[in-house]
Amino acid sequence: DRLRGTSKKGELTETIGFINGTSVTSTPTYNFLGAIQGRMPGLNIYRQGGDMPAAYGWKVRNSRTNLFLVDGIERDFYTMDPDQIESVQVLKDGLSTVMLGQRSAAGVINVITKKGNVGRPRFSFTAETGFEKALKLPDLLGAVDYITLVNEAYANDLREPGAYIEAYNPAIIEKYRNKENPYLYPDVDWYDELLNNTAPVHRYNFNVSGATNSFNYFVDLDWYRENGFFKTNDANSYNTNAQTNRFSVRSNLGVKVTSTTFMQINLAGRQERYNQPAAGTRSFYSNILTTRPNRYPVYNPDGSYGSYIDSKANQNLKGLLYDNGHQFKDSRHMSFDLTIKQKMDFLLDGLYLEATGSYYSATSYLTTRSKEFAAYLYKEDGSYQQVGEDKDQGNSGNKDQRYRITFLKGAVGYDHSFGKHKVAALFVADLNQIQDQNVQKGYLRNYTNYSGRMNYNYDDRYLAEAVYTRGGYNWLAPGNRWADYWGVGAAWNGHNESFVKELNIFSTLKPRISYAVTGQAICDYAEYKQSYGTSKVHLYGGPFDNKWTEENKTASRLNPEIAKKLNVGIDLGFLNDRLAFTFDYYQNRFSDVVATSEIKTAILGNVYPRSNCEKYSYTGTEMVLTWQDRIRNFNYFINGNLSFEQSKFEYSPQLPKAYPWMSRLGDPVGMTYGYVADGIFQSQEEIDAYDAFLPSAVKSTIMPGDIRYKDLNGDHIIDMHDQTNLGSKKAKGYYGISAGFNYRGFDFSVFAQGTLNRQVYLNGDFMDGSGKKGEGAITSYVLGRWTPDNHTNTHTRVWYGSNNNNRQTSSFWIYDADFFRLKNVEIGYTLPTLLTRKLGIPSVRIYAQGMNLLTVSEIFDVRKDIDPEIWGGSFPMTRTINFGISIKL
């Protein structure tokens, strides 16, 4: 292990969470993070928007940056095949990460890959097939309801009840209602037109492992295919669906070269093609929300694509899907790790040398083969007006990504016991060199560390550890590139004490404590240097012409951020560890946080450059409770984890605030700031009686059904002085619950996870009024809008044009969004060996898996058509059902 050498779990003083590899394979998703979401307290994994490959983000105890390691070496987590994983380590406290130097404050996940075990070769084959289904899609209104609301919004803006847009007069509405002519009066359900209800997924895996006295091996081959939800045109010679095809391979080989020399060679590769329509997957999900159902028909009577008169291009969504071409990104990832360990017992018992060299390369090439198509406006007289024109498919390509990591490490270690005393020492020098062609012109980033670690173990009872690192990063200014980080820890294996054994209560009793000073370098390349460029300026007495000007303000004093981390924990086991409990309390204090000050100066004429100007802290508790037992042939377990966290924004250079509620200091980190809503104006009399309004939304523009804001300072004006902390974007609590059993060949497992005290801000398309003058879709949620007959405080009125009052960031649009999600269920049956051995097969297991089967959330009380983790114009959260067979030889 790059960070520790080798240590048994019972000898650890750090706080490291472990997830077994079987927990990863039991979840039917190819995204590694999605498989471990909710399984570890302190590890927050959350769904992000975008296309399929960019689905998840993660933080460890709200880390500002993240680092993903495979066998202790930096990698891309998308390269992981679940069957390659032996275990997952989550490095939580500072003591476990100090040796990472200028990235030691990061949240760290370290995946340990499988190695061969002594014995004959073991072959394993797994085949899975299943399907995905979108959990939630916005419930969009049909044409009649849409037009009714648009007319109502139009009448509201005019303050003329019953007014309507001439194009949507009552006679026209009846034509829509009666579906008189779907070409002139279309009513299109774009989700139904573009998307299938389900999308198939397939996965096949083969691996072989084994070991002899001189070498061990593990070889894994994996193929995965995931289709998207888009409908396709069989007439096309190319695929326009959002589809992922991935092939990965790994070979881990350990060779005992001599009795004192061991060599580990790890090779891994992955090739993936992600195909999508030329317009991009995400654009369709977002464009559906901006296309009203009666904008144009999908097809005209003659079979051509429908369009509309003010269109300057062919924007027919079906045409964009079928006849706009496609694009695909080919990604290739390759890694090679070589480690040689040489025992030096002939010099000193327990002395060894270790050297590691590693190379990782990731490249991707984006090919776009787009074409254009003609669409037509169908007129009432039966004539057509062409929009756009047919053009042949083109072909363009470019390198989308080039990313390389070179890692070199040399280490001297010592591990020896003297009676009851065990001493271990590790001294490491390592270089991690990163080149990303997409970041800062591909300039090399060099992380250099010189580290030392000392461990002392007395009689497996008293454990102590100290670690020191001098870390450097070449993008900082020359005088600021190096920093010192250190940590200490201690633990007591109380269960090994004779007086504790006599109590016959604890099978494990291990309190532990650690404290570390860690850091992270956050800066751009040569941010400390002044750069210049040309721009047109007017000098006194001279012409308006190009001149050399300063491009940036230098950050010459930028230093690494500092994170001081304290962790106090205890591990308890009872009844021979059938009942186990772990508790941790942590306090992470971040100082010298890199940010841009809000203070501006007229003399400078610009904002200040980034500097180490902020401070904030996180404190939290984490708990894990497990019970596992066996009753004859019935084995079962239940596990629960729970974490709570509080944060505090402690310092930032701010302009003086007129009122205390305007300051961020003392607030939790990551808050939403805005106006405090005080209900809805229910009548004109309420508006007349109120005396505080926005300058951009004066009293005369306010109508019943608009939001009323609190005048916090009592100056009769709603402005910046009335903005305050509205709520947290981050959950304060996370939990996970798992249980399972196996009995006479049957096995079952279930896992659920959720959040506590979480809020979301629903604005934009989720507001009651379109504000787009009748363009864009409207959801069924808006049917509950405020009207003279529906005096609600949960919805505003609808509006047609702009609405400066209701569109302000305010507490009105913030909702509780805690959720409980049945994340994974798996049921399997292993055929009797008496049956399978007749076929020459030692083990055959058939199984079914389900992912995201049930979700319960407070947000459903507000909107039933959105998922609490992701919504709107992004690739939706999906439910997956898988069926599989596993054969072991």
Model-found features: residue ranges?
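Glycine-rich, aromatic-lined ligand/substrate-binding cores of catalytic
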Residues: 728-761
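Short, small/polar-rich motifs associated with maturation and membrane association
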Residues: 1-249, 263, 703, 713, ...
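Extracytoplasmic gating/loop element in the C-terminal half of outer-membrane beta-barrel translocons
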Residues: 297-304, 319, 755-845, 850
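Conserved small-residue
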Residues: 124-181, 279-280, 527, 614, ...
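C-terminal extracellular loops and terminal segments
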Residues: 608-617, 656-672, 721, 725-740, ...
